[in-house]
Amino acid sequence: MRVELQVGFWAGAFLLLVLLLWLFSGVLLPFVAAVVLGYLLDPVVERLERFGMNRLGATLVIMASFALLLTLLSILLVPVLWRQLSSFVEALPGYAVQLQGLISGEIERLSREYSGGLIEKLGLGKDAGAEFASATNDLVAQAAHWAGSFLNSVLTRGAALINLISLLVVTPVVTFYMLLDWDRMVATIDGLVPMRHRETVRELAREIHTAMAGFLRGQSLVCLFLGAWYGIGLSLVGLNFGLLIGIMAGILSFIPYVGSLTALILSATVAIVEDWPRWHLLTLSLAVVLAGQFLEGNILSPKLVGESVGLHPVWLLFALLAFGSLFGFTGLITAVPLAAAAGVVLRFAIARYRESELYTGETSPDPKLLLKTARKEDR
């Protein structure tokens, strides 16, 4: 009964935590960003401490260096990115119209060339090409309208401005205190763990730390590289909004599959609209994106991230959808590290289950009976 009460208590505590996170999901992003930054920068602070600096001084040095780096990036990149984003939002309706015209023209051309041949063999009517073109145009128009509305709301809505301000103001403050009190917080949490299970929990925490640290630090470097690769590469080949597309794809590369799809779809769309019917710009843009994907899949991720996550792609997709539906964009960002932590706990639970009486079917001997037997043997 005691075990059942413990299981019920921890299950209830977990459900309560999930409920609270879901209720406050709208304000979690700056705090999650601060925790991630604190987690990534804490080893640097500890290294400075080993050189003789105290915790406060090391934290101030790290935060000042980080603020200087962000300031330089803001001066160099933010004005350019803002101009490109504003221009992209303005050009998006025109791009949609041009893309509709290109798709309609190509479908009509193909339907004329293959009329009486392939279309009739497939059992389609004479107007199948026009109907397909109309449906495709409607889909493109709807997607362009949705994307334009979303980007316009990002630029104009007060909520987006508040979120941006909270990221710029709240995140550095919380990160500073996280770095300053990191060891104290870890010690406090460790002291709250029941003594009977402390070593087990510590072992689990070490495995979770290995999985999460490997992913967060490795994937952050991958995102930095891909953002620079896409942004510089697409700009050099002459793609309009190349820097914006590259930086956006680099940031979204923290979410598996999303960054690569963003780079591929946006670069191909802009290249087709700007350069059709020539293939020169499209070929160069796709070469940049595919080369980045090759480097990520065969060199960067194996070297920097490795097998630290240990999740099957199906479970990875499930984690993205589940956390994204519960916590929005914050859930998408945290889905992989949290799923990695859940995987460690699940593997531990399976291992304990295989050692249990329920799995083996063997009843463990009564300790009192063992003690009596040992005493008889001693006599």
Predicted segments, located by residue:
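Juxtamembrane/interfacial segments around transmembrane helices
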Residues: 56-69, 108-128, 211-224, 274-277, ...
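Juxtamembrane membrane-interface segments in integral membrane proteins
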Residues: 8, 44-51, 57, 64, ...
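Hydrophobic alpha-helical transmembrane segments of integral membrane proteins
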Residues: 27, 39-40, 75-76, 89-90, ...
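Alpha-helical transmembrane segments and their lipid-water interface positions
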Residues: 29, 33, 73-77, 104, ...
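Anchoring transmembrane alpha helix of integral membrane proteins
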Residues: 1-83, 87, 159, 170-171, ...
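Juxtamembrane helix-boundary/capping and inter-helix hinge elements in multi-pass membrane proteins
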Residues: 53-54, 194-199, 308-314
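Alpha-helical transmembrane segments and their immediate interhelical loop/hinge regions
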Residues: 4-6, 57-60, 146-270, 279-281
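Alpha-helical transmembrane segments and their immediate boundary loops
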Residues: 23, 208-366
